[in-house]
Amino acid sequence: MRTDKLLYGAAYYDEYMPYDRIETDFQMMKAAGMNVIRIAESTWSTWEPQEGQFDFTHLTHMLDSATKYDLDVIVGTPTYAIPSWLANKADDILALTHDGPSIYGHRQNMDITNPIYLEHAKILIEKLMEVVTKYDCVIGYQLDNETKSYDTCGPRAQAMFVERLKKQYPDINEFNHEFGLDYWSNRINSWEDFPDIRGTINQSLHAEYRRFQRDLVTEFLAWQAAIVDKYRHKDQFITQNFDYEWHDYSFGLQPEVNQYDAARCMDVTGCDIYHPSNDFLTGREITACGNIARGIKNANYLVLETEAQGNIEWLSYPGQLRLQAYSHIANGANMVEYWHWHSIHNAIESYWKGVLSHDLAPNRTYKECSVVGNEWKRIGSHLVNLKKKNRVAVIASNEALTGLVEFPMQSKTADGYNTVLRWLCDALYMMNIEYDIISSHSDNFSDYDYLFVPALYSASENELKALDEYALNGGNLLVTFKSGFSDEHLKIYHDTQPHIICKTLGIKYDQFTYPANVKISFNNVSSDAAEWMELVTCDTAETLCHYDHKVWNTYSAVTLNRYGSGRAMYLGAMFGENTLIEILKDFFKDDSRLTSNEFNARYPVVIKRGINGLGKEIVYLLNYSDKDQSIVNHKSKCIELISDCPIHEGDTITLAPWDVAILEF
């Protein structure tokens, strides 16, 4: 989805304010160069205080005021936090989960398959749409909020799951065989005897239920989109604020949603990206999570939520908020919107601070937002709709993620897959190599010169054959440990590991262990092996380094195979980032276009580039450090857009701490 301007703003909640100050707030937003707000998604109990009694006073107040101040509005459907009167209508509206029955109070605690919930959600959305569709300031709609299945395991959901299995496996014997249910006498000889899924010890069956739960999310969002679509104007978009696996901040692929499938009902991908700041600001999360969002539709995306002040430990240093905003745009976002405008005075998110603090007065954060907004008013037409053509892709897989939740690595945590994903992504980031993140089910592998495959533990034979074909036909393939081990149902393949791609990689193994006192060294850069190691032997591959260990030193840690007209590298263990970077330098060594840039810039200066809507090349120079950084322009003459100054070939560009320069060629 193309837009005619960069969108910059914040979520706004008139219904949370201690007093009516909307005139002051919107005047402040306009002065700060903000042009968009998101409203309505969080307060069903305000819009419908009792069943059938609707009160949209706050809603129309915001819309009328937004019209007055020429602010665009994104309206959220308020279905993720239900009112108490609805929770009391039936015992099964609140979800039954693996942990037991949900209790009213928290958000996202309902069963999204419950027909009573769905009936009332539909009524509310329709009533809301009848109000907002009259306003020209509304540019789009956000479906729900960070939607999940909320681990619904009630009788209804489980019955739906069984019906789905019956359609997939008309022969119940085939089902038992595929899922290995003879083990521990778990065999099911009649669908009517299907046990409660919460008690299963069969990871294949449990993973299948997790897949079913992800599909519930896809169906729920498509159901909402169909309702909204009846009312929206053709120039209004539909989106959703997808989020990520959470490590006290946004980290990686969301385990509970297949976002590639769920986004099909939407015009544009939206996302919520939160990350460390101050001394811990690196830009890694902005890039990795943004790349997931951009890759969902291979298009520009909207950052519907990110931190202004945020959690207590996220308070940014001067200049960082501006750097973060430009980093999102440099990555392909067309919007940066803060959660939220004002810091809330009650309840669980009181210390998740907005642009304004609790005193609601202009502050340092607001002033820095004003710098960003007014710069974007001036130069945004040169930055919006940035198009990227990256040569490196990292594939992502919900099935593999689930597999490593069910069968974790050494640390026994549920985030093993994303740890491996980010291991590769962050090394590329530190090398100033831009990359896409695409689905493992993608049919466009051949669009990329390099394809990275992190821990593809669960993969169908078709997926593995696609990797083989990619390398055979000239691609540069990099595969990590724990790939090609089990099929799409977590049944372990019973031939040479890794299945099918053992020939591609020119290696094999049949034993693995947790590393202890094992090091891996490459180009004199050494680090400890961690999490997992496979005892790899080479068939046609070349060993680049062995394990440094008194016993395991005969086995290969890193290998490279010439295969067809391509190459395939295998990493048999996880190890330190510095060692990984040295190995990647070797993998890329014959590709100077990838490993060098016209500025000889290295991290902490991050380079991002693309083609703008005017057809010109844009290069961002982002200083992720608290020290001045100097970069020499070895390209042709250009314009630095923020200062509107010419930069000639050979000129030195000096970036202040946490500063940014934008070059247009």
Name these PLM-found stretches.
Residues 4-6, 33-35, 67-73, 134-139, ...:
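Short, well-ordered coil/turn segments that N-cap beta-strands
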Residues 10, 29, 37, 66, ...:
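Conserved, mostly hydrophobic/aromatic
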Residues 16-29, 250-262, 317-325:
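Short, acidic/polar
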Residues 99-268, 272-279, 283-285:
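Polysaccharide-binding and catalytic clefts of secreted carbohydrate-active enzymes
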